[in-house]
């Protein structure tokens, strides 16, 4: 069994420190007890070792070399995965099989080592999936919830102090209404400052009367109660309303931009042709005035086909004539 040769190959190919490789080489001959120290770094290979024990039981295979070769294949796969950071498990398997080929010369031991690499592959995939599931993931609605939390904090800080006033309506016997209104007073939030006992008693006594907020003296109690409830509900749920309005505004703006670009008329400016005789052509164009089609008169004469031309005049010899 050429264990030193395999350790040398792993050290040169994978770049591991010699102390770690020496410990792993000793672990190949001492069983699963020494490999437990590297479970936290290289991953757990106990499941792969149990698969090797089921494949090569000692009562069927008296020789322990094949069992140790299979278990060593599990550890070699973990070492290769640790060096490659688990990027490509198929590449890790090929490197593990190459290390087994270099480490063992006999075919039975090589096959057992390759089987260990193959047995460790599904456990490595399962562990990688578990690690990926533990990583934090951002939900799609996280930006909306973040904006809502900011808005809620701002509204809570704005509602920490509010102004309030109380108003009394008294109706006399003659039908006249007398209004008593107090000046606005600042009231702090109950969770920030506890109210004294006398203020609580006065607030309980004031609730027996018709009370209005925001200093509106010419509205009745029912109308003010409905408006107050609506405004309070709006202030509590304003985060979602603001977020929805913002998202819809952005979508409408993008739609307007896309529609404008798609329906815009192409602006084409013809290029001016340069010519040596450009000035002369310009002058000729200015001098020539074309007549309109309405000013042209076409004159046609009727010709008769049956009429023949008249006889030619007689020839006169000028030499025999006397002038």
UniProtKB/Swiss-Prot annotation:
Record's subcellular location: Late endosome membrane; Lysosome membrane; Cell membrane; Golgi apparatus membrane
Membrane topology according to the record: Single-pass type I membrane protein
PANTHER family (UniProt xref): TRANSMEMBRANE PROTEIN 59 (PTHR28652:SF3), TRANSMEMBRANE PROTEIN 59-LIKE PROTEIN (PTHR28652)
UniProt record, GO biological process: autophagy; negative regulation of protein localization to plasma membrane; positive regulation of autophagy; protein glycosylation
Family membership: Belongs to the TMEM59 family.
Glycosylation sites: 90
Single GO cellular component term: extracellular exosome
Residues spanning the membrane: 239-259
Motif (ATG16L1-binding motif): 263-281
Species in which this protein is naturally found: Homo sapiens (Human)
Keywords for this protein: Autophagy, Cell membrane, Endosome, Glycoprotein, Golgi apparatus, Lysosome, Membrane, Phosphoprotein, Signal, Transmembrane, Transmembrane helix
Broad class of where this protein is predominantly found: membrane
Modified residues (Phosphothreonine): 303
Posttranslational modification: N-glycosylated.
Coiled coil: none
Self-association state and partner proteins as the record states: Interacts with ATG16L1 (via WD repeats).
Signal peptide: 1-35
One GO molecular-function entry: endopeptidase activity
Role description: Acts as a regulator of autophagy in response to S.aureus infection by promoting activation of LC3 (MAP1LC3A, MAP1LC3B or MAP1LC3C). Acts by interacting with ATG16L1, leading to promote a functional complex between LC3 and ATG16L1 and promoting LC3 lipidation and subsequent activation of autophagy. Modulates the O-glycosylation and complex N-glycosylation steps occurring during the Golgi maturation of several proteins such as APP, BACE1, SEAP or PRNP. Inhibits APP transport to the cell surface and further shedding.
InterPro entries linked: Uncharacterised_TMEM59
Protein name (Swiss-Prot/TrEMBL): Transmembrane protein 59
Impact reported for residue 273 to A: No effect on interaction with ATG16L1
Membrane topology (Extracellular): 36-238
